[in-house]
A protein has these predicted regions:
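A penicillin-recognizing enzyme superfamily signal
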Residues: 335-355, 363-365, 376-378, 384-408, ...
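Soluble, non-transmembrane domains of envelope/secretory-pathway proteins that act on or interact
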Residues: 1-6, 440-462, 609-610, 614-763
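Peptidoglycan glycan-strand catalytic modules in the bacterial/periplasmic cell-wall system
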Residues: 64-266, 480-483, 492-495
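Conserved catalytic neighborhood of penicillin-recognizing serine enzymes
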Residues: 130-155, 289-293, 426-499, 561-592
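Bacterial peptidoglycan biogenesis and beta-lactam-recognition machinery
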Residues: 106-117, 131-137, 182-188, 200-205, ...
Length: 763
């Protein structure tokens, strides 16, 4: 008796014997059924033992693509995403009626024949010959399973799908050989199980479990006889027998299956007759896929998780490898999203900014010391229906993660300047003259021994909120009131490099990925950043100087067949950005902003909090970024298109003459954080005593009627960088024109052979 080869295949003699029979049968199938114009020996004439033997001995079976479930930190479902809606189930969890129905209609002799059914071939050949067309196929269930494996392997590549389904001799040869292998290795029960899990049932449902849920909103194990017959009938032509779109045609097909089940003895004729009278009984669950299905307004966070998966090398070295894992699915992704914090964020957003408003808001909360993203939401809902205000642009994140180009943070950047100064040795009670108006200082030192020089010929002047805001000021008062001239004098004193270096240590970088330019205007928040960046940057203060990279994923498991395996996930990396003393000092300064400064409307009552307001040039955006020791959050309000100024505007049903960081974003932050922190421990800051730098009384009432700090109630730039009427001008008054021209490139700078900065150059 010939022996098997060491590789597990048959000997050449055995292969030749099998191939002889297979060739004749396949020739009959292909030539007489699939290609009636070709002679019955067409395949045999083109085939040979050698070509059959050249095929790989083992068929590679790719893991079946399945749905992926994204969970919040408590295990609650956020969304279900998939490339193919499929849930793999064992045969024991499939109704016996379903098992019998699919065998009866697709391959009634399944348990009697091998990989090829000779009787079936001859029967189909005879019927097709009499009808003159392809009326009946002869592929066994095993052969159909093999073909479906090739289709699954092709994925969404149309060329590969066409190759997997094309009616050619080569494909039939390959299909037949692998059918023989599958029969020998798996056995009938496993083949049936695999077939039921891989087959397409229409309506985006792959596999019997997804089909049962789609058409009947129940599990496959609970299907009754008429439901099973309907699903089994769909397989031959999912579009033709689609019960949702053609109930009559689907009913006819179902009844054919029931009749066939009675003919082979699976059910009695009486059962079949009764089942044929029953209505289809559809209870359709509409296909739901992707982050659009996310609950609690977490669609943007869901999309951020997807972006992390597709971009982080931990999930694969190449973009293609990562996409393959994601599209294969079967993943359970446990995220960092805190359901309480997310619910609170969305509630506050909905209360304060309507989705139909001319401007939008985005809010993000992170956990200091871990980098975990706890909440992420915005006023414009996730979706593709632009006419109804939906968008897929994530306003909270950087451009490379599905966001935009960012927004100028205004005076919320000033604490970073203060941190750099303190780290550089500046005392916390440092006093600057801080005049109401001053020329922009020049030169200012930059990195690598360079200097920024303003040689525009028309030096810009900057000014404070109003003419009564005149120094000297120390750091505490200047921070609480966000005095522009104080912070410009500060960066001019310490130089630009320590500030850009500190920003980088805190993870505060431009949303478009460009480097932070070496220009002194960064002290006033001119470089576009995202809310997630600012929230996580301020979390560095809350964690006493430790910066942690943001993370959204806690764990990932993947089901492959009957096994579950854990995947490695990105970890937050933490590093010290500043000393504890510096962080504690900043916390003390920013507590003053909330307690007795421009951010008083954002205060959390008895719970210690700190933060900073900010409003950008021309009021295109307003911010509040704040934190407690256990949560940090950022709220941005503005026009993503950078076209609508927030003067004379209605937001959330309320009219505003001019919008300030403490007036709209501040209350959003307060409500959001109050709900997110409810029930959480009340933690204290490590306060630092900061002695007064000036030993004289200040007129504390002179700015009682100010709307915001830095935010230049005269409609000027960057909290008073460019002046105008500042005597508490009414919101309905026209904005005055600047009293001087602005040097070209003042805010973003230029780079013409070394020139870079506020209309200046490096020397």
């Amino acid at each position: 008796m010939p022996k098997k080869r060491s590789g597990g295949g048959l000997s050449p003699t055995q292969q030749a014997a099998k191939f002889l029979g297979v060739s004749v049968l396949a020739g009959a199938v292909l030539a007489g059924i699939a290609l009636p114009a070709v002679g019955a020996l067409g395949l045999a004439a083109k085939g040979s033992v050698e070509s059959f033997d050249e095929l790989p001995a083992n068929m590679k079976t790719p893991p079946l693509s399945q749905r992926t479930t994204i969970l919040d930190a408590d295990g609650g479902k956020i969304a279900t995403v998939y490339s193919r809606d499929r849930t793999v189930v064992p045969l024991k969890d499939v109704s016996p009626y379903m098992q019998k129905a699919i065998v009866a209609i697709e391959d009634s002799r399944f348990y009697q024949h091998g990989a090829v059914d000779l009787k079936g071939v001859l029967r189909a050949l005879n019927k097709n010959a009499r009808s003159g067309e392809v009326a009946q196929g002869a592929s066994t269930l095993t052969q159909q399973y093999v073909k479906n494996v090739f289709v699954e392997e092709a994925g969404d590549d149309p060329t590969k799908v066409a190759q997997a389904t094309q009616q050619t001799i080569g494909r039939k040869i390959r299909e037949l050989k692998y059918a023989i292998q599958v029969e020998e290795e798996l056995g009938k029960k496993k083949i049936l199980e695999n077939y039921l899990n891989i087959t397409f049932f229409g309506q985006q449902a792959y596999g019997v479990e997804a089909a049962a849920q789609r058409y009947f909103s129940k599990s496959a194990k609970d299907l009754n006889v008429q439901e099973a017959a309907l699903l089994a009938g769909i397989v031959q032509s999912p579009s033709r027998y689609d019960p949702v779109n053609d109930e009559a045609e689907a009913t006819k097909r179902r009844n054919i299956v029931l009749q066939r089940m009675a003919e082979v003895g699976d059910i009695s004729r009486a059962q079949a007759a009764e089942a044929m009278k029953a209505p289809l009984g559809l209870k359709v669950s509409k296909p739901k896929n992707g982050c659009i299905t996310a609950v609690k307004g977490a669609g943007f966070f869901c999309d951020y998780v997807r972006q992390v998966f597709l971009t982080d090398p931990v999930f694969g070295k190449t973009k293609e490898e990562r996409a393959k894992v994601w599209n294969q699915g079967g993943l359970t992704v446990r995220t960092t999203l805190d359901p309480q914090a997310q619910k609170s964020a969305q509630r506050s957003i909905k209360e304060h900014v309507y989705k139909s408003d001319e401007v939008a808001t985005a809010a993000t909360i992170v956990q200091p010391g871990t980098g975990k993203i706890l909440a992420m939401g915005q006023s414009r809902p996730y979706g593709v229906d632009i006419k109804n205000g939906e968008t897929t642009l994530n306003l909270s994140v950087n451009d490379d993660m599905g966001g935009g180009m960012g927004y100028q943070p205004g005076s919320t950047f000033k604490p970073i300047v203060a941190a750099a100064a303190l780290e550089d040795g500046m005392p916390a009670n440092k006093v600057y003259s801080s005049p109401y108006q001053m020329a922009y200082p020049s030169p200012v030192s930059a990195c690598d021994g360079k200097r920024w020089v303003n040689d525009s010929g028309n030096p810009a002047k900057l000014e404070n909120e109003n003419s009564s805001e005149v120094g000297p000021y120390d750091m505490k008062e200047a921070t609480a009131k966000s005095v522009n001239t104080y912070y410009v004098q500060m960066i001019s004193d310490i130089g630009i490099c320590p500030v850009t270096t500190m920003a980088k240590k805190m993870g505060v970088e431009r949303a478009d990925g460009d480097k932070m330019p070496q220009v002194p205007s960064i002290a006033l928040g001119t470089q576009e950043v995202s809310p997630l960046t600012m929230a996580n940057g301020y979390a560095t203060f809350a964690s006493r100087g430790m910066y942690c990279t943001p993370v959204a994923i806690e764990s990932v498991s993947q089901r492959v067949g009957d096994r579950k395996k854990s995947l490695e996930v990105p970890k937050s990396t933490c590093s010290r950005a500043m000393s504890e003393k510096t962080a504690d000092t900043i916390n003390t300064l920013l507590k003053g902003v909330v307690e007795d400064g421009t951010g008083s409307k954002a205060g959390l009552g008895s719970r210690p909090s700190a933060g900073k307001t900010g409003t950008t040039d021309e009021r295109y955006a307003a911010w509040f970024v704040g934190y407690t020791p256990n949560m940090a959050g950022a709220v941005w309000v503005g026009d993503p298109a950078h076209k609508r100024k927030m003067s004379g505007i209605t937001i959330g049903g309320q009219s505003y003459g001019k919008v300030f960081g403490g007036e709209v974003p501040g209350p959003i932050w307060r409500v959001m954080m109050s709900g997110a922190l409810e029930g959480k421990p009340v933690e204290q800051f490590n306060d630092v005593h900061i002695p007064d730098g000036i030993n004289r009384d200040r007129d504390k009432n002179r700015d009682d009627d100010r709307g915001d700090e830095d935010d230049n109630d005269n409609g000027g730039f960057i909290g008073g960088l460019v002046g105008g009427n500042n005597n508490g001008g009414g919101g309905g008054e026209p904005l005055p024109a600047p009293s001087f021209s602005i040097p070209e490139g003042f805010f973003r700078g230029q780079d013409n052979g070394g020139g870079n900065g506020n209309g200046g150059r490096f020397g």
